[in-house]
């Protein structure tokens, strides 16, 4: 991220290496340089041990990565790039627009995910990050306002439950990332075929069929107007019949 910049020419900086000097985020200390390698190894081991990743898992990984802050510079930018590339492997259509448009909100949300002041009854919360990533990954339209994150903000319009526009609330479902990606594609294109889902996600046909069966069993989707010429209907946010 810093290759070719003035920082990359400093003696204490090596592109791609873990930090050699302590750093902090929003006035809060992060992992010490001598702790970084072990903490990153533990974080990656914990995440990779999970066979089926969920929306909550990717959020938890991101928060813990930021708490470690393994690099001297560019941690937030690097994490954003990693996130975008990783989500694309599941078939999500994501880009850097959300990070650019809401960069200040995103940084503040990271701080609120780590900030505790127990003496004054203030606890760390990830709900603001949840809304950001829900917009990024799942296409919801939560209203992202910095003032909602102020610890003394009294009138809670931060929409921790309801988005600005009542789209299907995929962020509240018990699904893996693979299943969420397929569900989002069906939501956007109810006539999509299984072979098209294979192309979009890079998954095998058997995997797509398994996911579709799961989504139907959970009553998240159903087939209407026949098997051959019909289409899919998303039942999220609708009464099940």
Language-model features: locations:
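FIC/Doc superfamily catalytic core
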Residues: 1-241
